[in-house]
Amino acid sequence: MSPLKPLYKLYEWYISRNLRRDRMPRHVAIIMDGNRRYSKLQGSMNPIEGHKKGIETLEKVLDWCVDLGIEIVTAYAFSTENFKRPEKEVKGLMKLFRENFEAIASNEKIHKNRVRVRAVGKLELLPEDVRRAIEIAEKSTEQYSDRLVNIAIGYDGRQEIVDATRKIAEDVKAGLIDPEDIDEDMINRNLYTAGLEDPHLIIRTSGEERLSGFLLWQSSYSELYFCDSLWPELRKVDFLRAIRSYQQRERRFGV
């Protein structure tokens, strides 16, 4: 055990004790960056090992969110750009996605905490077996409303806006709506995330300071927090620091 671990535990307790429950972000979105770099640092040439560790980290983060009363989590798992990665890595990722979505139906913790699971993105780009697994996961949790976990997979924020405007244009062409009726609410209703509250806080790991196409429309007034830790190495103290930073900010919403 690291000699610093007891100190971090004490620090975790201190931060958690001073967080205000009435100022907790309701929706936290996460860019889970750094899995591949983690694999290399561990001496593995197989990036899938880093992605497996990343899934374990996501499970821990979801537990922390339950403890803190955070109701909505959106995790950026796989972008449309990621399809350009080596074929072996993409196939390995799809296998991981399929296995983990399939496991949701029998996950006791998911059902105990009444967590609804949803996938958002251009899902038609995914292999059929992954889409079936997503359908199983969504169907097995659709009755829950206490908490919501969105997995952004096959997702790109620009493409999301393009697809939304294309659907609206088709409705205009069909005479279902007038161009004058188009407003922000209509665009919101046609996004992959339709019906989802905008994120209050977006966290990105690995030290990169950009959104990389994540929730571009929805993040106008989101607070951003960048963490140096690689995603598989994220500690609870890192997550608590992000929440503390959010609570220390004054949200102006453009005013």
From Swiss-Prot:
<comment type="function">
    <text>Catalyzes the sequential condensation of isopentenyl diphosphate (IPP) with geranylgeranyl diphosphate (GGPP) to yield (2Z,6Z,10Z,14Z,18Z,22Z,26Z,30E,34E,38E)-undecaprenyl diphosphate (tritrans,heptacis-UPP). It is probably the precursor of glycosyl carrier lipids.</text>
</comment>
<feature type="binding site">
    <location>
        <begin position="79"/>
        <end position="81"/>
    </location>
    <ligand>
        <name>substrate</name>
    </ligand>
</feature>
<comment type="subunit">
    <text>Homodimer.</text>
</comment>
<keyword id="KW-0460">Magnesium</keyword>
<dbReference type="GO" id="GO:0016094">
    <property type="term" value="P:polyprenol biosynthetic process"/>
</dbReference>
<feature type="binding site">
    <location>
        <position position="223"/>
    </location>
    <ligand>
        <name>Mg(2+)</name>
    </ligand>
</feature>
<keyword id="KW-0479">Metal-binding</keyword>
<dbReference type="GO" id="GO:0000287">
    <property type="term" value="F:magnesium ion binding"/>
</dbReference>
<comment type="similarity">
    <text>Belongs to the UPP synthase family.</text>
</comment>
<feature type="binding site">
    <location>
        <position position="51"/>
    </location>
    <ligand>
        <name>substrate</name>
    </ligand>
</feature>
<feature type="active site">
    <location>
        <position position="33"/>
    </location>
</feature>
<feature type="binding site">
    <location>
        <position position="83"/>
    </location>
    <ligand>
        <name>substrate</name>
    </ligand>
</feature>
<keyword id="KW-0808">Transferase</keyword>
<dbReference type="InterPro" id="IPR018520">
    <property type="entry name" value="UPP_synth-like_CS"/>
</dbReference>
<feature type="binding site">
    <location>
        <begin position="210"/>
        <end position="212"/>
    </location>
    <ligand>
        <name>substrate</name>
    </ligand>
</feature>
<dbReference type="InterPro" id="IPR001441">
    <property type="entry name" value="UPP_synth-like"/>
</dbReference>
<feature type="active site" description="Proton acceptor">
    <location>
        <position position="82"/>
    </location>
</feature>
<feature type="binding site">
    <location>
        <position position="85"/>
    </location>
    <ligand>
        <name>substrate</name>
    </ligand>
</feature>
<feature type="binding site">
    <location>
        <begin position="34"/>
        <end position="37"/>
    </location>
    <ligand>
        <name>substrate</name>
    </ligand>
</feature>
<feature type="binding site">
    <location>
        <position position="204"/>
    </location>
    <ligand>
        <name>substrate</name>
    </ligand>
</feature>
<feature type="binding site">
    <location>
        <position position="33"/>
    </location>
    <ligand>
        <name>Mg(2+)</name>
    </ligand>
</feature>
<protein>
    <recommendedName>
        <fullName>Tritrans,polycis-undecaprenyl-diphosphate synthase (geranylgeranyl-diphosphate specific)</fullName>
        <ecNumber>2.5.1.89</ecNumber>
    </recommendedName>
</protein>
<dbReference type="GO" id="GO:0045547">
    <property type="term" value="F:ditrans,polycis-polyprenyl diphosphate synthase [(2E,6E)-farnesyl diphosphate specific] activity"/>
</dbReference>
<dbReference type="Pfam" id="PF01255">
    <property type="entry name" value="Prenyltransf"/>
</dbReference>
<dbReference type="InterPro" id="IPR036424">
    <property type="entry name" value="UPP_synth-like_sf"/>
</dbReference>
